[in-house]
From Swiss-Prot:
Residues 54-154, 349-380 are annotated as: Disordered. Residues 67-84, 129-140 have a biased composition (Low complexity). This is Genome polyprotein. Belongs to the potyviridae genome polyprotein family. Genome polyprotein of potyviruses undergoes post-translational proteolytic processing by the main proteinase NIa-pro resulting in the production of at least ten individual proteins. The P1 proteinase and the HC-pro cleave only their respective C-termini autocatalytically. 6K1 is essential for proper proteolytic separation of P3 from CI. It comes from the Viruses. Pfam families: Poty_coat. It catalyses: RNA(n) + a ribonucleoside 5'-triphosphate = RNA(n+1) + diphosphate. Residues 85-99, 106-123 have a biased composition (Gly residues). One of its GO terms (cellular component) is viral capsid.
Length: 380
């Protein structure tokens, strides 16, 4: 009701904050007091509802909510066939009396009738039957005749993306593939590529790196950004060592590379592949403010600065990479690794011989490796 403020009962508050529950006696007290103080409020919501029953003519057209029955009309003369009352539309007009019922209808208008001393109101359908021909006038529209020259709606058939008829791998006469799953399985290429470290490996490297530097996550974001820019310029070869640097305004900060390389698994370049998109966007941003080409591209002598965004060695090629960019990146990679010689085995540190020498020599022997030759001396 208007003018009444919202109210929360004490029992509701106890149930909300204490969970004590509500008893029927408490609700009954509130209801009695409510009826006593606001009788008009209760009366407005105690409305009586009446339902009217009747027989619906399923063949009636042109109206809604018609009451009564409509028997078929036969014979000659004008004879209405609707009991009850209603309004409708039709052609012509007619009057009739059947069994003490009076009915008057017009082409477009309303009609009223009485049956057994009871009157009703509503909307219905007027029907006028004249002569043996039995002309029927209805308020609704007639069904459209079927035109032999018309054509139906033609739809283009949709082919299935994967047919059941294709040959699939089977195990014990059962398919081993789930076709419905394949239709919705569209992972990112980078997430399942074996050239990029898994998320678990990256998390392990990140935690070990942070632990070695003894910094928090907020400081790590700054350090990781500086490391990415340093790798754009200097590459991410696993053979690099020493320190890496980043600038703090005009001051140069030096960080050791040992924890960066040692904790990278499988390789440092596979770790850095996670930074590929960010590095590409950074190079593009630098080129929007100044001419910028990473050192990796300067060594390859690239003259087209539009390819600068691909000129770093941990760039990750995808299906969206343009063909010209892929060719340029592969040529740069081929030039970078040209002349490199990777040995599977290095020099074995165990160079001592394990063979035991059992030869016995004396001072009279000719040499260390030769026995006496009957007094012959060997001079060097």
């Amino acid at each position: 009701k208007e003018g009444l403020a919202p109210y929360i009962a004490e029992t509701a508050l106890r149930n909300l904050y204490l969970g004590t529950g509500i008893k029927e006696e408490e609700i009954e007290k509130y209801l009695k007091q409510f009826i006593k103080d606001l009788p008009g409020y209760i009366e407005d919501y105690n409305e009586d509802v009446f339902h009217q029953s009747g027989t619906v003519d399923a063949g009636a057209q042109g109206g809604s909510g018609s009451q009564g029955t409509t028997p078929p009309a036969t014979g000659s003369g004008a004879k209405p066939a609707t009991s009850g009352a209603g309004s409708g539309s039709g052609t012509g007009a007619g009057t009739g009396v059947t069994g003490g019922q009076a009915r008057t209808g017009s082409g477009t208008g309303t009609g009223s009738g009485a049956t057994g001393g009871q009157s009703g109101s509503g909307s219905g359908t007027e029907q006028v039957n004249t002569g043996s021909a039995g002309t029927n006038a209805t308020g609704g529209q007639r069904d459209r005749d079927v035109d032999a020259g018309s054509t139906g709606k033609i739809s283009v058939p949709k082919l299935k993306a994967m047919s059941k008829k294709m040959r699939l791998p089977k195990a014990k006469a059962k398919d081993v593939l789930h076709l419905d799953f394949l239709l919705t399985y569209k992972p990112q290429q980078q997430d399942i590529s074996n050239t990029r470290a898994t998320k678990e490996e990256f998390d392990r490297w990140y935690d070990a790196y942070k632990k070695e530097y003894e910094i928090d996550d907020t400081q790590m974001t700054v350090v990781m950004s500086g490391l990415m820019v340093w790798c754009i310029e200097n590459g991410c070869s696993p053979n690099i060592n020493g320190n890496w640097t980043m600038m703090d305004k005009d001051e140069q900060r030096v960080f050791p590379l040992k924890p960066v390389i040692e904790n990278a698994s499988p390789t440092f370049r596979q770790i850095m592949h996670h930074f590929s998109d960010a590095a590409e966007a950074y190079i593009e941003y630098r080129n929007s403010t100044e001419r910028y080409m990473p050192r990796y591209g300067l060594q390859r002598n690239i003259s087209d600065y539009s390819l600068a965004r691909y000129a770093f060695d941990f760039y990750e090629m995808t299906s969206r990479t343009p063909a010209r960019a892929k060719e340029a990146h592969m040529q740069m990679k081929a030039a970078a690794v040209r002349g490199s010689n990777t040995r599977l085995f290095g020099l074995d540190g165990n160079v001592g011989e394990t063979q035991e020498n059992t030869e016995r020599h004396t001072a009279g022997d000719v040499s260390r490796n030769m026995h006496s030759l009957l007094g012959v001396q060997q001079h060097h």
